[in-house]
Design a protein with these regions (language model features):
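Acidic, metal-coordinating catalytic segment for phosphate/diphosphate chemistry
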Residues: 4-34
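Nudix hydrolase/Nudix homology domain
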Residues: 6, 49-54, 125-163
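Active-site-adjacent beta-strand/loop module that shapes the phosphate/pyrophosphate-binding cleft
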Residues: 30-31, 94-121, 132, 137, ...
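Conserved Nudix-box catalytic region and its N-terminal flanking loop in Nudix hydrolases
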Residues: 38-78, 82
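Conserved beta-strand segments that form the floor/walls of ligand-binding pockets within enzyme
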Residues: 55, 89, 110
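Structural detector for helix-capping/boundary residues
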Residues: 59, 73, 86, 134-137
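A short coil-to-beta-strand element that immediately follows conserved catalytic motifs
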Residues: 82-92
Length: 163
């Protein structure tokens, strides 16, 4: 039941006559988790092989994993960074249109973590072909940016005073 909170929230508002900002299509991927690695007013995005959009490091939550554990695992797999759970703050769980065609929409738990100067810059590999430090103040006109970042993460960062 917990995995469907975004869908339940959207249905709640629809039943009350409020049109949500994002309507769920037929195919939605739930159980996603991602990390917004912040360096100043930028965040690290990745572009996977064959993808058009850059996205936050993240992916599907495996059976038996918590969203936090999945975020840490995905960050390690995609950036080679070993993150300390104490350094991650849950920003929220957000619904958004999918960026790269695996589905029509997503529901994703997002965690924020400050970049440490001692960490090495990630290097592209067979899965991740590009890393990009996205300037969060000037990315709204960039068609390569994922709807999750533009429509959900940036507003949440601003609301919390993190941007």
């Amino acid at each position: 039941m917990k995995t469907c909170t975004c869908l339940i929230r959207a249905t709640f508002w629809q039943l009350r006559g409020v049109v949500p900002e994002y309507r769920y299509p037929d195919q939605v991927i739930f159980n996603l988790s991602a990390v917004c690695l912040m360096r100043g007013r930028t965040c690290l995005n990745v572009r996977k092989r064959g993808a058009d959009h850059v996205i936050l490091p993240g992916g599907k939550i495996e059976p038996g994993e918590t969203p936090l554990e999945a975020a840490i695992r995905e960050a390690r797999e995609e950036t080679c960074l070993v993150l300390d759970p104490a350094d991650l703050t849950h920003l929220g769980t957000f619904d958004a249109p999918a960026a790269n065609g695996d589905a029509d929409g997503i529901c994703c738990a997002v965690y924020v973590c400050d970049w440490q100067d001692s960490w090495p810059e990630p290097v592209p590999d067979s899965e991740i072909v590009e890393y990009e430090w996205t300037d969060l103040d000037h990315c709204h006109d960039d068609a390569r940016q994922a709807p999750l970042l533009l429509g959900r993460v940036i507003p949440a960062l601003q609301q919390r005073g993190l941007l």
